Amino acid sequence: RQLLQTLGCQGRTRPLALYGPAGLDAIWPALRTLTGPLPYPIRARQLDKDPVDLAAFGWPAGAQLLPIPTRHRVPSRGYALTLPRAGRFLPEKARALGVPVADWKKLQHGETVQVREWEVTPAEVLGPPRRGLKFVFSGDTAPCPALEAAAQDADLLLCDATYAEPEQEAQAKQYGHSTFGQSAALAARAGAKRLWLVHYSPMITEPEECLHFAQGAFPRAECGFDGKQLTLQFEEELHG
């Protein structure tokens, strides 16, 4: 409620798409009443198992938000955001098919174009698909196969790290959370590129002092914090 009201106070007028797990449909009318009048419309949608096509919200074609069933004391979801990347544009093929230069960008953006009496599809002028980007957020969860599968080859995984020490694994399991080491081990098994630990318990006042519990299993583990930012780059851009 406070976040929605804050967005209104900041002058937001653009529509907001709000997604949530099972149960959202039941509580949304009451929550919307509590927010009071807002200067922007909200489209609330309950997520099941199907991915959300993000193209309608201005993302590139093929971008998806996938709900992940996680393991917590109450029904919970993590989320995987995937951004595919088309193959490299092959101008020689476009020329051979008679595609005007003015239409090349349409093909690069996944659109089919009309050339005289026939259509030319992107697949006819693009190389093999290139590696895209994947961002995964665990939400509150104990380690589970669904999260590990979703985090395969992720560029960035934000993972529950409620407890720091290995001796707290039983407590973490009881309450549906993870330790620093468990999240790091999951990231390593999944082949993630980066791991940010999040959702610390109040007992962890200095997360950096506990980071060694994670870096033994996953050296690229970092402590997440409010406002931390990272620009993810495609592989060609990363390696020059």
Regions found by a protein language model. Give the residues of each.
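Active-site-proximal loop/helix segment associated with metal-binding centers of metalloenzymes
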Residues: 59-150, 156-158
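General small-molecule cofactor/ligand-binding pocket signal
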Residues: 19, 43-48, 66-68, 222-224
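Active-site HxH/HxHxD metal-binding segment of metal-dependent hydrolases
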Residues: 1-46
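Short loop segments at secondary-structure junctions
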Residues: 23, 83-86, 235
